[in-house]
């Protein structure tokens, strides 16, 4: 699916897992109703949560389970507007629960379909989580100006001017021997020497 930048938050792939399946189910159900095709009815039955009605896991709670099945994708879609990674996680969790229930109840067709959807949602969650970690790492390491001392220590430094005392740079109240000065990610060279040093990338 190719979406514009403005629609990217509303047309998220994770919600399509639910909505596309529900849409196809509804259209197939209408088609079967118009043609009286019992085999199509059975096929649809095997691919919806109705298949779990006869299992021990759901037989006593089918009514609220159906309501949850309908409302769950709505909630996750709304959640995706502000918390996309979290909504992917809940998609994988919900689809995985239905798949597990189908497997335990011996409904292997239902289990395989929802298991594939759960896996796709989980992959989306992993991708989003990895991107979030990369963004967090960049946010914490975006400083490009720093000083490397002779012991390999890295000290953040914003100014191109370094004040020396006794041949050492004063950083945070401590005196360190400068090995390299990096400005905007580039190794700098001393420009002028006075009572202080000015470095230029």
Swiss-Prot record:
<dbReference type="GO" id="GO:0016020">
    <property type="term" value="C:membrane"/>
</dbReference>
<keyword id="KW-1160">Virus entry into host cell</keyword>
<dbReference type="GO" id="GO:0019031">
    <property type="term" value="C:viral envelope"/>
</dbReference>
<keyword id="KW-1015">Disulfide bond</keyword>
<keyword id="KW-1165">Clathrin-mediated endocytosis of virus by host</keyword>
<keyword id="KW-0945">Host-virus interaction</keyword>
<feature type="glycosylation site" description="N-linked (GlcNAc...) asparagine; by host">
    <location>
        <position position="53"/>
    </location>
</feature>
<dbReference type="InterPro" id="IPR001332">
    <property type="entry name" value="Arteri_GP5"/>
</dbReference>
<feature type="glycosylation site" description="N-linked (GlcNAc...) asparagine; by host">
    <location>
        <position position="38"/>
    </location>
</feature>
<comment type="similarity">
    <text>Belongs to the arteriviridae GP5 protein family.</text>
</comment>
<protein>
    <recommendedName>
        <fullName>Glycoprotein 5</fullName>
    </recommendedName>
</protein>
<keyword id="KW-1133">Transmembrane helix</keyword>
<feature type="glycosylation site" description="N-linked (GlcNAc...) asparagine; by host">
    <location>
        <position position="46"/>
    </location>
</feature>
<keyword id="KW-0325">Glycoprotein</keyword>
<dbReference type="GO" id="GO:0075512">
    <property type="term" value="P:clathrin-dependent endocytosis of virus by host cell"/>
</dbReference>
<keyword id="KW-0261">Viral envelope protein</keyword>
<comment type="function">
    <text>Major envelope protein present in abundant amounts in the virion envelope. Mediates virion sialic acid-dependent attachment the sialoadhesin receptor SIGLEC1. This attachment induces virion internalization into alveolar macrophages predominantly through clathrin-dependent endocytosis.</text>
</comment>
<feature type="topological domain" description="Virion surface">
    <location>
        <begin position="33"/>
        <end position="63"/>
    </location>
</feature>
<keyword id="KW-1162">Viral penetration into host cytoplasm</keyword>
<keyword id="KW-0472">Membrane</keyword>
<dbReference type="GO" id="GO:0055036">
    <property type="term" value="C:virion membrane"/>
</dbReference>
<keyword id="KW-0812">Transmembrane</keyword>
<feature type="transmembrane region" description="Helical">
    <location>
        <begin position="109"/>
        <end position="129"/>
    </location>
</feature>
<feature type="signal peptide">
    <location>
        <begin position="1"/>
        <end position="32"/>
    </location>
</feature>
<dbReference type="GO" id="GO:0019062">
    <property type="term" value="P:virion attachment to host cell"/>
</dbReference>
<keyword id="KW-0732">Signal</keyword>
<comment type="subunit">
    <text>Heterodimer with the membrane protein; disulfide-linked. This heterodimerization is required for transport to the Golgi complex. Interacts with host SIGLEC1; this interaction plays a role in virus entry into host cell. Interacts with glycoprotein 4.</text>
</comment>
<feature type="transmembrane region" description="Helical">
    <location>
        <begin position="64"/>
        <end position="84"/>
    </location>
</feature>
<feature type="glycosylation site" description="N-linked (GlcNAc...) asparagine; by host">
    <location>
        <position position="37"/>
    </location>
</feature>
<keyword id="KW-0946">Virion</keyword>
<dbReference type="Pfam" id="PF00951">
    <property type="entry name" value="Arteri_Gl"/>
</dbReference>
<keyword id="KW-1164">Virus endocytosis by host</keyword>
<keyword id="KW-1161">Viral attachment to host cell</keyword>
């Amino acid at each position: 699916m190719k979406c514009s930048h403005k629609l990217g938050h509303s047309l998220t792939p994770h919600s399509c897992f639910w909505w596309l399946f529900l849409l196809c189910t509804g259209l197939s159900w209408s088609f079967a109703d118009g043609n009286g095709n019992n085999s199509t009815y059975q096929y649809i039955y095997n691919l919806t949560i109705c298949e779990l009605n006869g299992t021990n896991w759901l037989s006593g709670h089918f009514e609220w389970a159906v309501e949850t099945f309908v409302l769950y994708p709505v909630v996750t879609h709304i959640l995706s507007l502000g918390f996309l990674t979290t909504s992917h996680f809940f998609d994988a969790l919900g689809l995985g629960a239905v798949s597990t229930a189908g497997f335990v109840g011996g409904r292997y067709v239902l289990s395989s379909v929802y298991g594939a959807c759960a896996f796709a949602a989980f992959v989306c969650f992993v991708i989003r989580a990895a991107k979030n970690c990369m963004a967090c790492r960049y946010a914490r390491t975006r400083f490009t100006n720093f000083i490397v001392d002779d012991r390999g220590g890295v000290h953040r430094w914003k100014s191109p001017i370094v004040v020396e005392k006794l041949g050492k740079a004063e950083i945070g109240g401590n005196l360190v021997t400068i090995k390299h000065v990096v400005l905007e990610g580039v190794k700098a060279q001393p420009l002028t020497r006075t009572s202080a040093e000015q470095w230029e990338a």
